[in-house]
C-alpha cells in the first residue's frame, strides 16, 4: 500500500474519573485499512499541549494525508464530526496532568476559529445507519485544543484534520445519560473513515 492514502486515527485515554474511554476501545477494533487507506492508530494522553505535540509528531513521521481524532462527549446521543474548533481553552475539570486553564488561547494571537478540513457532511451521510450528525461545538477542553492546534499547524498544507466525538458506551453504566453500543461506534467510525478516504 505504498501509493495509498494514510489516515492517522487517534483516541484519548480515560479522563475525568472514568476507568475507560470509549474511543480507546473503538480504536483497537477498527480495521487496519478502510477503502484504499491505511490506518495509523495511536492513543494519546488527555492533556493540553502534550496531546497536540504527540499527534503532530506522529502525523509528520508517518507522512499521513489526513488526521481523524476521536474523543468522548458524554451526554451526546450521536456520533458527531466536529465542524469547527475555537481558540480557547476553558476547562471545567483538570486534564490528566492536573492542568485546568481558564480562558487561555490555544495559540496566542491565532485566529478565533478554524473549520475542520475533513468532509463532515459526507462523513455523517456515510454513517446513515448510525445516529450521527454534524456538531458545531467541540467544547473548550482538550479535544477542541487538539483540533484547533492541528488545523493551525497544518493550515496551508495538504494534510487534512478533523475530530469526531462519540457518546458514552454501555460499559460505562451511565443510567441517566445516552449510551451507544461499542460495536455501533466502531461501525460508524469505520464508515466515516471511508468517507474521508473517498473525498
Located regions from the model:
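N-terminal catalytic or cofactor-binding beta/alpha core of small enzyme domains
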Residues: 2-140, 152-156, 177-199
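Short active-site-adjacent structural elements
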Residues: 17, 143, 169-175
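Short, solvent-exposed polar/charged micro-motifs at secondary-structure junctions
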Residues: 51-53, 145, 173
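Glycine-rich beta-alpha junction loops
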Residues: 74, 167-170
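Active-site oxyanion/phosphate-handling segment shared across diverse enzymes
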Residues: 138-158, 162-168
Amino acid at each position: 500500500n505504498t501509493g495509498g492514502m494514510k489516515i492517522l486515527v487517534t483516541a484519548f485515554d480515560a479522563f475525568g474519573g472514568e476507568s475507560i474511554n470509549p474511543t480507546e476501545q473503538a480504536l483497537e477494533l477498527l480495521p487496519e485499512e478502510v477503502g484504499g487507506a491505511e490506518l495509523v492508530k495511536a492513543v494519546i494522553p488527555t492533556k493540553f499541549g502534550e496531546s497536540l505535540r504527540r499527534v503532530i509528531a506522529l502525523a509528520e513521521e508517518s507522512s499521513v494525508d489526513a488526521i481523524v481524532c476521536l474523543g468522548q462527549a458524554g451526554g451526546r446521543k450521536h456520533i458527531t464530526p466536529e465542524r469547527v474548533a475555537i481558540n480557547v481553552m476553558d476547562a471545567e475539570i483538570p486534564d490528566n496532568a492536573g492542568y485546568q486553564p481558564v480562558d487561555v488561547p490555544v495559540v496566542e494571537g491565532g485566529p478565533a476559529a478554524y473549520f475542520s478540513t475533513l468532509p463532515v457532511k459526507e462523513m455523517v451521510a456515510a454513517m446513515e445507519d448510525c445516529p450521527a450528525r454534524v456538531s458545531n461545538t467541540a467544547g473548550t477542553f482538550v479535544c477542541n485544543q487538539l483540533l484547533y492546534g492541528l488545523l493551525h499547524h497544518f493550515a496551508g498544507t495538504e494534510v487534512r484534520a478533523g475530530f469526531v466525538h462519540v457518546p458514552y458506551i454501555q460499559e460505562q453504566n451511565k443510567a441517566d445519560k445516552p449510551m451507544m453500543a461499542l460495536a455501533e461506534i466502531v461501525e460508524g467510525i469505520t464508515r466515516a473513515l471511508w468517507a474521508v478516504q473517498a473525498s
